[in-house]
């Protein structure tokens, strides 16, 4: 399930983490918790299956058989998303979408739904000012068919609070433009990474 072209070296079985090259790469990570994951996390089949089961159990514990629509962030690929969908199919989930973005770590946004997903695309963020040319995760745009009507879903994963607040303003502007571009019922959700101090400013 590993994306070989992505920098996701934390999520590998421990036997792949014993080389000096791997250790050197991990030790260059400045955040200790991330460094420790990179060095010591044993991401094997058993660990992966337990994680999927825990996520599925959390989802179906909400209400009766889970929410109608699930927005996910930091999903590695369609392979793992489909495994989660398979666990959820007995509870009425029928469709999913993940479009591979350009994130170097290979983590993307995704949707799982009890309604048919009829269209989907990514909207990339263009930063302005001093952050022009920087990259971030795009907004996932999905169109669902609900009782014969279209419903638009925007799933976001904005830059973390580690970054300057202006790096969340540009994505919010893109989202605002998308909301104004049509008259369909819309839900915008996901990880906005806006803290309480920023909330009043944005």
Question: Model-found features: residue ranges?
Answer:
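N-terminal, active-site-proximal structural segment of metallo-dependent hydrolase catalytic domains
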Residues: 1-87, 98-101
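Active-site regions of metal-assisted phosphoester/phosphodiester hydrolases
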Residues: 1-30, 114-202
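Generic alpha-helix detector with strongest preference for long hydrophobic helices that associate
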Residues: 36-40, 93, 156, 160
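Solvent-exposed, polar/charged alpha-helical surfaces in well-ordered, non-transmembrane soluble domains
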Residues: 53-61, 79-86, 110, 169-173, ...
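Short, well-ordered loop/turn elements at secondary-structure boundaries
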Residues: 65-66, 106, 182
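Structured beta-strand-rich core segments of catalytic domains in phosphoester-bond hydrolases
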Residues: 69-71, 75-150
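A broad "ordered helical/assembly scaffold" signature
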Residues: 57, 68, 93, 98, ...
């Amino acid at each position: 399930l590993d994306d070989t072209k992505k920098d996701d070296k934390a999520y590998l079985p421990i036997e792949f983490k014993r080389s000096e090259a791997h250790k050197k790469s991990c030790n260059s990570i400045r955040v200790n918790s991330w460094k420790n994951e990179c060095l010591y996390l044993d991401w094997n089949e058993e660990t992966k299956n337990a994680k999927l089961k825990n996520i599925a159990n959390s989802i179906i514990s909400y209400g009766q058989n889970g929410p109608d629509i699930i927005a996910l962030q930091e999903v590695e690929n369609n392979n793992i998303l489909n495994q989660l969908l398979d666990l959820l199919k007995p509870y009425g989930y029928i469709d999913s979408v993940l479009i591979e973005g350009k994130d170097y770590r290979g983590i993307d946004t995704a949707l799982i739904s009890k309604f048919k997903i009829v269209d989907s695309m990514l909207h990339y963020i263009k930063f302005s000012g001093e952050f022009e040319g920087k990259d971030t995760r795009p907004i996932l745009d999905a169109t669902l068919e609900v009782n014969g009507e279209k419903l638009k879903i925007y799933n976001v994963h904005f830059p973390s609070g580690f970054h300057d607040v202006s790096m969340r303003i540009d994505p919010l502007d893109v989202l605002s433009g998308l909301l104004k571009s049509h008259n369909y019922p819309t839900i915008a959700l996901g990880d906005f990474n806006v803290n309480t101090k920023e909330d009043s400013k944005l």
